[in-house]
Amino acid sequence: MIIVNKEDCIRCGACQGTCPTAAIEVTPEDVIYCDICGGEPKCVDICPTGALKLEDLVVDEAGNTQGRIVFNPDKCNECGDCVEVCPPQILKLDEGKVKKVPLQGFCVMCQKCVDICPVGVIGVEGIKEPAKVELEIEGPIFIADCVGCGMCVPECPVDAITLDKVGGVIEIDEDTCIKCGVCAQTCPWNAVYISGRKPEKRAKEIKKFELDEDACIGCNTCVEACPGDFIVPRTSNLTVELPAICTACGLCEQLCPVDAIDLEVELGPAKPASEEGLVWDEEKCDFIGACANICPNDAIRVVTKEGMKVPDNEKVDEEPSFAMCTRCGACTVACPKGALSLVDMDKVVDGEVVKRKRVQYNPALCDQCGDCIEACPYDMLKLTDEKVPLKGFCILCDQCIPACPKGALSLK
């Protein structure tokens, strides 16, 4: 059966594009695929007409076999029992459509997904293990194997990223960067890591990916530049073949000397650092400061409309503003002693128990070096003379939520 290392998948969707039976789907959050239920496919067991069968297929020269699902559309009465029982919910019936093969989503063990994966994270159980990425992420900003596509550059909200030339390596100004993680979410090759996290990717849709064959001169610049080897040279007619789906990094388009490639990509919204856990709604906030006053760890700072900064109760000449620890994790990466860490805790959101991150601090390990203070993108952290010397990190106690009279704070 097919196995996927979801942890290191870059969510490019090439596997989905090449699968002949739509047995794998890629989203920013997950990779859903037919694993033939570990060798005992429930769809085969429940099919009342015998339209679905499990067969062994020889998959290598050594004679090793793997199970595959075979579908006979002539026997299928489209009852939908297989769809209902499918654990990953990958099986689908194209109801109401005239198709020779009405059922999609079963694995035929063609291994096209294995062959096309640009980072090798798709394998076959007992035959080929999925690749694993071994990285020692250092610092709150970490760049590894950047291909220089520049896709992240225009997406940075504070213009902290520069790229001298296409195909080079990006640079991120640490003084400007706010550790929001938009670059990491955008990077099609997982080359950027912010605050020590493996990013959740943004949704992405290729609107147009076309080749002007009349303009193409067959130089193969795009073939050589493609980090995933997605582009196939067609030497017989001095052109190339573009893939149906790829990472859409745009290197081929940018490096083509005759502008023969036209790529148009639409990115979904980036995930803000505070989209999960404690979330602030700016439209509802009246900058009263009740949340900052009740926070036991000074993890919220408000400048009121009267010019009072709370919880410091200091008069300032500033516009009304709100800042809080978003549990981005930059401080935990910067800490050389391991005194700060991001830990999961159970929270109830919309009636369901979910895992959410909180910052955990061990004062016994802290040497008060101040590295965390410098790393904090929102300038929330500060050292004090108290027994617990560090303040400003969110422990997700939720006391601020009921304190807000406008309902501007919530748990998501």
UniProtKB/Swiss-Prot annotation:
One of its GO terms (molecular function) is 4 iron, 4 sulfur cluster binding. Its cofactor is [4Fe-4S] cluster. It comes from the Archaea. [4Fe-4S] cluster binds at residues 9, 12, 15, 19, 76, 79, 82, 86, 107, 110, 113, 117, 146, 149, 152, 156, 177, 180, 183, 187, 216, 219, 222, 226, 246, 249, 252, 256, 325, 328, 331, 335, 366, 369, 372, 376, 394, 397, 400, 404. Keywords: 4Fe-4S, Electron transport, Iron, Iron-sulfur, Metal-binding, Repeat, Transport. Gene3D superfamilies: 3.30.70.20. The keyword Transport applies. PROSITE patterns: 4FE4S_FER_1 (PS00198), 4FE4S_FER_2 (PS51379). Binds 10 [4Fe-4S] clusters. InterPro entries: 3Fe4S_ferredoxin, 4Fe4S_Fe-S-bd, 4Fe4S_Fe_S_CS, Fe-S_Ferredoxin. Residues 2-29, 30-57, 67-96, 97-127, 138-166, 168-197, 207-236, 238-266, 276-305, 314-345, 357-386, 385-412 form the 4Fe-4S ferredoxin-type domain. PANTHER family: ADENYLYLSULFATE REDUCTASE, BETA SUBUNIT (PTHR43687), FERREDOXIN III (PTHR43687:SF1). This is Polyferredoxin protein MvhB. It comes from Methanothermobacter thermautotrophicus (strain ATCC 29096 / DSM 1053 / JCM 10044 / NBRC 100330 / Delta H) (Methanobacterium thermoautotrophicum). The gene is mvhB.
